[in-house]
A protein has these predicted regions:
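Conserved beta-hairpin
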Residues: 26, 68-83
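Short acidic/glycine-enriched loop/turn segments that link adjacent beta-strands
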Residues: 195-200
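Active-site rim helix/loop that mediates acceptor-substrate recognition in acyltransferases
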Residues: 42-70, 75
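Conserved hydrophobic beta-strand within the GNAT/NAT acetyltransferase core sheet
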Residues: 116, 150-152
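Conserved N-terminal entry element of GNAT/NAT acetyltransferase domains
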Residues: 1-47
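Conserved acyl-donor/pantetheine-binding loop and adjacent beta-alpha core of acyl/acetyltransferases
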Residues: 65, 78-119, 160-174
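Conserved acetyl-CoA-binding loop-helix of GNAT-fold acetyltransferases
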Residues: 116-121, 127-143
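Conserved active-site alpha-helix within GNAT-family acetyltransferase domains
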Residues: 143-148, 156-191
């Protein structure tokens, strides 16, 4: 199911689509182009034990069937970004995490929550609102596949030195920011003991 299209101030049309049947586009955004070269392939949370040759094969299989491993953003038809969104139970690292807790309260067990764990935007498409569109599309994708709650574990937007909203670098911000998730209607459920780029990460939730 496609998310509604959006037109940013620059005039381009953004569309967010499931990654099912679009492995080649996923590979352009989140993979590596040299066979066997080191790269995450968005496997860090899923199963980091797989080697460099196994990772693209795993994700190709995930992209071959519903619900798929996430969503892709397209700007005027060109693949531009990626968000990993899947049930928490599919992320081995999260199921064994000592720093990101399970929440037992609420109408849905933590293991049944869908989780948006990673965002990637191609350099030429940054600063165009793509992460907002990706998160909105990820939530819609999760809802379409029966999710009742979506979680994320973004970093604190505020500067850790107490100087307001500081600039977040691309590497630290791959998990998103609290400001991004708050704009999408998520609320802070718990502070975690996980950090990225020296900033604390929050467990944020949205009922869908």
């Amino acid at each position: 199911m496609a998310s509604p299209t959006a037109t940013p101030p620059t005039g381009e049309t953004i569309e967010v689509l499931p990654a099912v049947g679009r492995f080649d586009d996923f590979a352009l955004v989140a993979g590596v182009q040299k066979p066997g070269a080191g790269g995450c392939w968005c496997m860090s949370y899923r199963d980091s034990r797989l080697n460099n040759l196994e990772r693209p094969l795993y994700m190709a299989d995930e992209c071959s069937r519903d619900p798929g491993p996430g969503v892709l953003a397209y700007v005027d038809g060109e693949v531009a970004g990626w968000c990993s969104i899947a049930p928490r139970s599919s992320y081995r690292r999260l199921m064994n995490s000592r720093t990101i807790p399970f929440l037992d309260e609420g109408p849905v067990a933590a293991a049944d929550a869908w989780v948006a764990v990673c965002f990637v935007v191609q350099p030429k498409f940054r600063h165009q609102g793509l992460m907002n569109a990706l998160l909105e599309g990820a939530v819609e994708h999760a809802r379409a596949h029966g999710a009742r709650v979506v979680e994320g574990y973004p970093i604190e937007s505020a500067d850790p030195r107490g100087q307001g909203a500081g600039k977040v670098d691309v590497i630290s911000g791959y998990v998103g920011t609290t400001r991004l998730f708050e704009r999408a209607g998520f609320t802070r459920a718990a502070e975690t003991t996980a950090h990225s780029g020296g900033r604390v990460r929050w467990l944020m939730r949205k009922l869908v």
